Amino acid sequence: SMPLINSKGVRQTPWSEGQNVRHLEPMGFIKFDLLGLSTLAMMETAIELILKRHFRNDNPTFSDVKSFYDRYLHPDKIDLNDEKVYENVFHKGNFVGTFQFTEDGARNFAERVKPNNIIDVSAITSIYRPGPLSANVHEDYIEAKGSPQYIKYLTPEIQEITEETFGFLIFQEQIAKIAHALGKDLSLDEGNLLRKLLTKKGTGKGFEVKDRIHKKFIDGCIEKGIAQTEAQALWEKFEYFSGYGFNKSHAVCYSVISYQCAWLLTYYQAEWIAAFLDKEPESRKEEAINTAKSLGYSIAPVDVNTSGRTWEITKDGKTLIQPLTSIKGFGESAMIQVLEHRPFKDIEDLLFREEVKYAKLNKKVLDRLCRAGALDALVDDRFTGRKHFWSAAVVERPKTKKKFHENIEKYRGEGDFSEEEIIHFKTELTGIFPMNLVISPETIEKLKEKFIPPISEFDEELQICWFIPRKVIPKKTKRGKDYWILQVIDSNNETEKITCWGIDPKKDSIHINRPYMSRLEYDPKWGFSTRSMYRNFRLLG
């Protein structure tokens, strides 16, 4: 047993100086690596929403969440061969928020493989790494899975061990099993030792043990009728594979989590999308919102009377309500004041409620609520626009109703915010891009009539499309030449990147959040590009 001590309230194990985790196994202990995954928090949020919407549980506890998980998602209970899950997610490429499938490359690979079971998924995640990809294993694997009848196995033992991966050595455990099956008096423990030694280099004791196992393996293969050259080739395949082999137990465990995400996405899509929006980091929030829109969901703007702590779902399941927490700078203390005292029937009700603690719901918070659009529903016909409302109620924060009414008259000429201001406020404070303010549906229809599609529907023959730049990333080539990467969006809420070569920073310019029409080149590997912004870009409107 290992002794425990209590040090500053934390239980610890008293290690002797110089000892570390590598000493655990020889001493008879098992080392566990406990990893925290944000995906698990996303699953918890999704389950809470499911319990609220489908099980009439308005305040689910962690115990309630665990009960749902144990009943539907636990590895011992979930159906890992559900065709609907594989078809809906892995075959169609609908991977929203799916663990291990956040990159386009992994998604495209999975779509081409079309996995049918958890081992297929594990193989995909094991192959989609730098080593196997550089060795072109992914292409060979796709070909083999598509035509398994043409796979040739050296021996029945190898077929039994590698048939689930279509003849490929994908998992480290396969080496241990093949070495045990074909080697002369080679135990499973020695096979497992070989698995470990193959990943190490050197001429010490480990090398001597590997050399001994090598001899036993070759001798065993020869006794089983395998030619020495073929046996040696198989051994060399072991050594080559050790450069990129993956642990099966690890791969399968992680793939089960991927499958659980896919199951939630298949059977409770709205809840999963809401949880996905809630947990995505700020840097990817806009892209996540665009993904939700592309799946047919409407995004209800943030509202002081209807928005909550997290993304919520309307009763019809078609609209996702942006939370108050999505407003930058809107903290927990202000949240408590809003949730405890709403609904607010008008702006006076918000500004002068006796029980509201205005030290928490202060001018800075009100400013963010107003500019983010969360107070738009409180703008009545006394105001000439939202800027008038903002100036009277927030900028010169009135302490009395009399002062507020004076402010209404004082700032009557303010009117509304400009479109540029609204776009800036929305994107700066909430992360939602107001497409309808940037390009009108009428303009989009006219472009369609002229056969000018959005960039997501780019036609390589026409080469002309339209888009809205959202971000400019200046770059330099190895020779010091300037170029830009444009991050753009279109009416399908799909984001793309355009490489703009030959940039002259003194002459070339781009207007963010304004629609452009352009002639572009497209390469399947490198994406969209243009050789001249000056010749090929035209500002619309």
Predicted regions and their residues:
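Noncatalytic, beta-rich nucleic-acid-contacting surfaces in large DNA/RNA-processing enzymes
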Residues: 1-541
